[in-house]
Structure formats: structure tokens, C-alpha cells
């Protein structure tokens, strides 16, 4: 069995292997899409293929949509050459369920794959043709937050961005210049409206995308490459909108175990490849089942019926509330607690931590118990149901290869949102945050983690963090097994509003965190003992 249009003719074999096939005519959908594209997507990687491709597949299957998605890769052209075109743009979607079983389905909704290479005439001319089509309704993105960045920390444009600014719109290279140039093409072809939708997992994603596109356009205007009228066109949200969105679906790299099971079913040529840009990608995509996509409903040229495939269409304020619910209460704070304690207690898989009585109890306390009284309720999703699914379905999923070490990366940049917002809400509601028990325990766990010594007293490597040098320097005289070596070294960290968004002493929990920390450095097994003492009724 081969994952190609020819290979799908062997319908019985696929059926016997328990793999669902599209109910629609894939070639006809591709033909219609090429003639009259309505949806272009930039960033042809895994989350796009299984989640966004799955949405389109659902809509085509139900007759809500006649056309698929035009997929554009802006960074790693090997993806098109090695994963799209040899497999006729098909994708084998594998859903990894919490009970260890899988659901498998072929998606035929990715109608065309194009490389955003302005120096290759057939690729670039095709993109210009698509953007000139007045019926194009939306372009969407999963290029990661880095794809929108134009400047480095020094405030100067990255050299490759500066090159795009200096060059004319005819030969762009970076994603933002490519999109800006194609919007200029659309403007010149008659100024048809368009929705430009970021689906990347970062807050205020639509604003970030809009700022980058506008910056590029204004730089080109200064050089006389584009007109002020073009800048006005993309500045007018009734012409070119930049809806905000919230996306949530864990899509790990292709798993070896999944690849083996597909090969055992008789599927050929399904193994992952490593591209020249170091992308690890396969003809199949594996991901968890739960998925959320919430989009601000602002589409000036119409849109597919996305809500009929489970997408929540709403206003900008609600998108923001869902994002806030997820990152400040229902998912991210739980992840960070498991990350820091997982490293200190010797875990290498987040899912395994949920079998640990104390750590399981800790996330129950942080989310449902302490988070819920002050949670941002978006109205369209139940925070209680969301956090329940996170704790009972998503984090314990044995297929999820997430490690505490990866999630512990950049924790100093995350604790302000993940814990600081709840602490501030308690101060606003109750005058202080002294009611909190589990969140101070999570913060104490992070401080204990920063010693780089596990609960047995053995050293481990700390994950990267922009504040690591500063934080470890503050704690350099604290010695594992010597409680008396603690002489207030945490004060500079816990009172730092740049880290937590609030001085934790003013919130009434700084001293409590210090006490917990001192208990946790007492010697081997002290972290486990402290968790037990503080997480029993």
C-alpha cells in the first residue's frame, strides 16, 4: 500500500488496515482549488497538515466546501519536494489516544503545494496568479512566532530582513516580505479584500503579523518601491483584516512506534525524513485528539463555514479570554509545575509524572482548586471542562513525548503569566494571596530547580533561560543539604516585578515560598517530603 492517489485505489486494503479514506473525489477537489483558490496557508508543517488540513477535510466531506487548501512553504522547500509532491499532497493523520490506541485517516484536502521561491518563475508566478484572484478569501499561517520577527534584541533588522527591505518586492526571501509582496500584487490587481489569519501559538498573534507586514510595507514605501495607497489598503481592516486566534493541539514529531505500526500494516515509504534545514517530518502526522481553534470572525471577503468543523468563531475579546484561560490557569501553569519538579525528581516524560501521587495532586490544586475562583471565563468554552481534559486526558497521554526538561526552558519568562496573573487576581479579590498553597509550592519548586541538583543530591543540567546567569548567581551560596546556607538569597528573585508581575512579598506569599524552599534543600528526599507534607488534607 502506498500513500499516493494510485495507491488509494486499493480501497479494500486500506479498509482492512483500519485506515479511513476521503469520501470525496480528491483529484476533482484539487482541480477546482487550482482553478479558483479560496484559502492559502503558509507554513506547511505538521500542525497545519493534521489540524487545519483536518478542518478542510471535514468541510469538504460534508459538502460545505468544494475546494481544498493551497499550501505554501516559506522556509524549508524540501518539505514540498520530499513530503508533499511524491505523495500527491496526501497526508496520513494519526490520532494518538490517551488509552494507547490510534485512529488513522488519509486527508485529501491539501490541494496544491507551492514553494515561496521568488527566484523560481513557475513557483512565484503561480503565487502571484493566486493572490490576484478576487475570490481568494483567506490566507493563514503556522510559521511559528519567529517567522514574524523582523528585528534582533539590539533593535536592528536581521540582515536577511534588511536585504528584503533593500531589494524590491519582486524578489523577497523572508516570509513577511513574501506575503507583503503578494499583497502588493493583490492591491495592483484590483484591491480585493482578504483576511490574513495567524494561527500560530502566541498571544495577540494577529497584531504581531499585522505589525510585521505593515513595517515591511512602510520601509518599501520610503524607498519608493510601493505607494502610500498600498500602505493604506493593508492598514484598513475592512479591506485587509488580521483576525486574532488561539490554537491548541499538541503535535509531536513523527514517532518511531507509529511509523513501525504503519509499516506493519503494509504501508510503504512512510518513514520520516530529515530535510536539509533539519526538519524532521514524515508522510504521516501524529497528534493528540483534543484540539481547539478560536478565531476572531472578521473576514472582509467571506470565508469557509469553519464553525461547522469545530472552529469557534467569535470576537477579539473572547479570543483573548480563551488564550488567557489557557495560559494563566488551565494548561500552562500545570505544565511548568510538572516541568520543574519533574527535573528535580528525575522524570524524563511529562505523562509519567501524572502517575506520581504528589505531582498529580499538585496540578489538581493549581488548576481546579486555586485557579478556578479567579479564572477568565470566555463563555464559549468551559474552563472546568478544559482543565479536566488537560489533567485526565491530555497530560497523561503516554504517546505525548513531552519532557519536563523541554518545558522548563525559559521559565523566568513564563512565571509572570503562568502564576503572577492568578496571584494578582487573588490580591485584587481577597486583599492578598495568602490562601494559595500549591502555587507557592510550584514557585518554590522552580527556585529549588535552579540549584541544578536533584532530590538525590546529584547534579543535572538546567534548561536554557535568558535569566539563567543572573538567577543562578543569586543562589550561588545556597548549598544542598545545608539549610543554614540560606540567608535570604531568594528575596531579590521573589520581589522582582519584572519576573512575576508583582512583588510576592507584597502579595503575602514571599515568606511562605522561602520556608518551602528551605525545607526542599534540607538533603536527599527533602523535595518529596515537602510535597507530601503540603499536599495532604
How does the language model describe each region?
Residues 1-42, 46-537:
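Substrate/ligand-engaging "lid" and interaction regions
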Amino acid at each position: 500500500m502506498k500513500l499516493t492517489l494510485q495507491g488509494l485505489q486499493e480501497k479494500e486494503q486500506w479498509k482492512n488496515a483500519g485506515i479511513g479514506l476521503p469520501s470525496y473525489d480528491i483529484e476533482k477537489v484539487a482541480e477546482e482549488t487550482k482553478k479558483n483558490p479560496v484559502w492559502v496557508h503558509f507554513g506547511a508543517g505538521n500542525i497545519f497538515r493534521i489540524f487545519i488540513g483536518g478542518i478542510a477535510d471535514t468541510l469538504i466531506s460534508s459538502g460545505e466546501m468544494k475546494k481544498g487548501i493551497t499550501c505554501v512553504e516559506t522556509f524549508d522547500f524540501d518539505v514540498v519536494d520530499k513530503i508533499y509532491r511524491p505523495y500527491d499532497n496526501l497526508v496520513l493523520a494519526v490520532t494518538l489516544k490517551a488509552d494507547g490506541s490510534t485512529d488513522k485517516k488519509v486527508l485529501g484536502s491539501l490541494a496544491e503545494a507551492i514553494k515561496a521561491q521568488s527566484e523560481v518563475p513557475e513557483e512565484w508566478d503561480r503565487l502571484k496568479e493566486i493572490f490576484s484572484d478576487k475570490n481568494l478569501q483567506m490566507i493563514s499561517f503556522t510559521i511559528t512566532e519567529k517567522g514574524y520577527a523582523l528585528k534582533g534584541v539590539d533593535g536592528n533588522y536581521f540582515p536577511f530582513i534588511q536585504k528584503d527591505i533593500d531589494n524590491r518586492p519582486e524578489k523577497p526571501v523572508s516570509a513577511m516580505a513574501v506575503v507583503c509582496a503578494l499583497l502588493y500584487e493583490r492591491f495592483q490587481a484590483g484591491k480585493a479584500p482578504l483576511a490574513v489569519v495567524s494561527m500560530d501559538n502566541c498571544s495577540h498573534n494577529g497584531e504581531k503579523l499585522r505589525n510585521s507586514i505593515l513595517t515591511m510595507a512602510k520601509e518599501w514605501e520610503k524607498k519608493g518601491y510601493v505607494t502610500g495607497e498600498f500602505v493604506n489598503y493593508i492598514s484598513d481592516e475592512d479591506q485587509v483584516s488580521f483576525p486574532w486566534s488561539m490554537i491548541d493541539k499538541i503535535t509531536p514529531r513523527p514517532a518511531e512506534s507509529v511509523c513501525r505500526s504503519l509499516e506493519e500494516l503494509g504501508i510503504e515509504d512512510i518513514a520520516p525524513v530529515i530535510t536539509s534545514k533539519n526538519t524532521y517530518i514524515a508522510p504521516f502526522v501524529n497528534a493528540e485528539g483534543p484540539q481547539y481553534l478560536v478565531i476572531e470572525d472578521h473576514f472582509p471577503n467571506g470565508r469557509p463555514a469553519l464553525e461547522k468543523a469545530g472552529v469557534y468563531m467569535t470576537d477579539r475579546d473572547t479570543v483573548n479570554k480563551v488564550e488567557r484561560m489557557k495560559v494563566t490557569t488551565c494548561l500552562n501553569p500545570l505544565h511548568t509545575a510538572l516541568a520543574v519538579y519533574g527535573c528535580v525528581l528525575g522524570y524524563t516524560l511529562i505523562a509519567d509524572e501524572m502517575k506520581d501521587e504528589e505531582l498529580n495532586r499538585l496540578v489538581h490544586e493549581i488548576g481546579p482548586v486555586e485557579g478556578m475562583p479567579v479564572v477568565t471565563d470566555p463563555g464559549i468554552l468551559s474552563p472546568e471542562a478544559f482543565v479536566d481534559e488537560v489533567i485526565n486526558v491530555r497530560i497523561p497521554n503516554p504517546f505525548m513525548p513531552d519532557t519536563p526538561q523541554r518545558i522548563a526552558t525559559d521559565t523566568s519568562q513564563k512565571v509572570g503569566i503562568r502564576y503572577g496573573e492568578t496571584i494578582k487576581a487573588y490580591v485584587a479579590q481577597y486583599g492578598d494571596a495568602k490562601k494559595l498553597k500549591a502555587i507557592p509550592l510550584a514557585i518554590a519548586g522552580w527556585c529549588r530547580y535552579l540549584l541544578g541538583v536533584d532530590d538525590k543530591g546529584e547534579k543535572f543540567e538546567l534548561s536554557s533561560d535568558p535569566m539563567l546567569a543572573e538567577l543562578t548567581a543569586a543562589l550561588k551560596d545556597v548549598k544542598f543539604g545545608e539549610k543554614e546556607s540560606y540567608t535570604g538569597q531568594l528575596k531579590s528573585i521573589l520581589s522582582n516585578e519584572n519576573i512575576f508581575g508583582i512583588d510576592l512579598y507584597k502579595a503575602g506569599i514571599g515568606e511562605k515560598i522561602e520556608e518551602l524552599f528551605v525545607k526542599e534543600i534540607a538533603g536527599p528526599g527533602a523535595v518529596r517530603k515537602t510535597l507530601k507534607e503540603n499536599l495532604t488534607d
